[in-house]
Amino acid sequence: MTAIAPVITIDGPSGAGKGTLCKAMAEALQWHLLDSGAIYRVLALAALHHHVDLASEDALVPLASHLDVRFVSTDGNLEVILEGEDVSGEIRTQEVANAASQVAAFPRVREALLRRQRAFRKAPGLIADGRDMGTVVFPDAPVKIFLDASSEERAHRRMLQLQENGFSVNFERLLAEIKERDDRDRNRAVAPLVPAADALVLDSTRLSIEQVIEKALQYARQKLALA
């Protein structure tokens, strides 16, 4: 009988540092990486490209069922490929982020993408980045981490990220959007953003990314008994 590949789930709100942590852990452990948020962003982008109504669950489900998405890790960077095109930059805009939160609220859309996400589970292991990885997608994962940070700190990080990419941003507006998104994600009927009962809750507000990575890797290795 073939053993099921282990999974480390990293859940948490937007801007908490999940992406950076997951890439660092995947590199340290030499495991596969799933950015589930990117899948929802890719779906949102595909909907925008194909002029699909973001408010129509019936229209979004077929698109989700046939979504052509894959991840390619190159020199520590994660390329997100949609229909053969690198959309890594395009999916990181605030417009797509807000649209992704909208489409993720639909139960049948989430169900359509669930099987695709679980297919990323392969040996030697998987680092799964998302919002419901430990509660819904991989409830049997041996290691679960919920990475959090204050909304103000997350807005500040997002502002710096956007400015580095040449975007002009208003902090107060960005903070309001993050709070609105948090409220939507935490209170949706299906797969709300909550820590799994057996997850380590790690607050990164006053921690450097190096400290976050060190704490997460130490916890994961203890749980998995990895040297």
Curated annotation (Swiss-Prot):
HAMAP family cross-referenced by the UniProt entry: Cytidyl_kinase_type1
Name of the molecule in the record: Cytidylate kinase
Name its species. Salmonella choleraesuis (strain SC-B67)
Identify the gene encoding this protein: cmk
What Enzyme Commission number does this protein have? 2.7.4.25
Q: Which reaction does it catalyse?
A: CMP + ATP = CDP + ADP; dCMP + ATP = dCDP + ADP
Any Gene Ontology biological process = nucleobase-containing small molecule interconversion
Gene Ontology molecular function: ATP binding; CMP kinase activity; dCMP kinase activity
Protein's UniProt keywords contain Cell cycle: no
The reply to whether Transferase figures as a keyword in the UniProt entry is: yes
What family is reported?
Answer: Belongs to the cytidylate kinase family. Type 1 subfamily.
